């Protein structure tokens, strides 16, 4: 006499359930209803955004999210007002997909209009409160193409070049203890990747102060072999050599790489 068991069998089918095929990565574009503003020409501007979610993170209940802010459209090839081209030109999707730390990615298209920058419209549009709301909007957009609506585990912010006009004001809000930096997505900030960001001494100070104000957050500053940002940073550190860097801030001089090489070669390294 024997007892027949059904471990590993699907009831009623008599066969083991085949493993589910992995979902393909999610790639989509959406228009943000959070980052909207009236520009210097009194025209309403919206923000097109590209999302990439690696296959390994599809339908996960909790995810890390990378927000990457690009610079001016001066690198080759150009991105031509298309956030998906920013992703492809800098291989951000491939880097995120292959990174040890798995994370979803969103790249908003920033309209780097000189008048709008000078008048503060862009930095206002990306101030702390709007960043928090934007992250929630991104999670909602991911949910539309998923079985679950993910919640945020950790936030990673990255930026290149002219993105100083977003990262520096945000850094100063953190340093001043602005309430929105202590709640929502920004309360879950775990990493900042700043590539050729400082263009003025104030920017270098802001990044250092940001690191000091959030000792649990890791900061990575990457610099090209030549140009204004590495020069500014070198001068700043020489002037303040007696002040040690925060222990959670590292800077890297990429002595063989040009300004436009940085995001495409190294962004994934710092995730």
Model-identified regions with their sequence ranges:
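A domain-start/cap signature at the N-terminus of enzymes
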Residues: 1-65, 103, 238
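Glycine-rich nucleophile elbow surrounding the catalytic serine of serine-hydrolase chemistry
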Residues: 70, 158-170
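Alpha/beta-hydrolase fold nucleophile elbow
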Residues: 148-161, 192
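Conserved hydrolase catalytic core segment
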Residues: 169-188
């Amino acid at each position: 006499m024997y007892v027949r068991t059904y471990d590993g069998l699907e009831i009623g089918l008599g066969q083991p359930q085949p493993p589910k095929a992995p979902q393909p990565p999610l790639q989509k574009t959406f228009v943000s209803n959070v980052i909207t503003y009236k520009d210097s020409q009194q025209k309403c501007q919206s923000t097109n955004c590209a999302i990439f979610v690696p296959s390994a993170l599809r339908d996960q209940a909790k995810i890390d999210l990378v927000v990457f802010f690009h610079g001016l459209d001066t690198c080759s090839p150009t991105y031509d007002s298309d956030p998906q081209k920013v992703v492809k030109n800098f291989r951000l999707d491939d880097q995120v997909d292959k990174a040890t730390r798995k994370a979803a990615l969103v790249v908003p298209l920033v309209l780097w209009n000189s008048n709008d920058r000078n008048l503060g419209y862009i930095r206002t549009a990306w101030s702390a409160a709007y960043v928090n709301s934007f992250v929630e909007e991104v999670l909602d957009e991911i949910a539309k193409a998923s079985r679950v609506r993910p919640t945020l585990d950790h936030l990673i912010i990255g930026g290149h070049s002219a993105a100083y006009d977003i990262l520096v004001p945000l850094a100063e809000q953190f340093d001043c203890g602005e309430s929105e930096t202590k709640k929502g997505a920004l309360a879950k900030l775990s990493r900042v990747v700043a590539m050729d960001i400082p263009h003025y001494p104030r920017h270098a100070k802001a990044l250092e102060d940001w690191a000091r104000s959030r000792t649990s957050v890791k900061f990575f500053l990457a610099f090209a072999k030549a140009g204004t940002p590495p020069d500014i940073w070198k001068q700043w550190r020489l002037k303040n050599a007696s002040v040690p860097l925060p222990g959670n801030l590292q800077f890297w001089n990429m002595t063989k790489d040009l300004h436009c090489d940085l995001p495409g070669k190294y962004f994934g390294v710092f995730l």
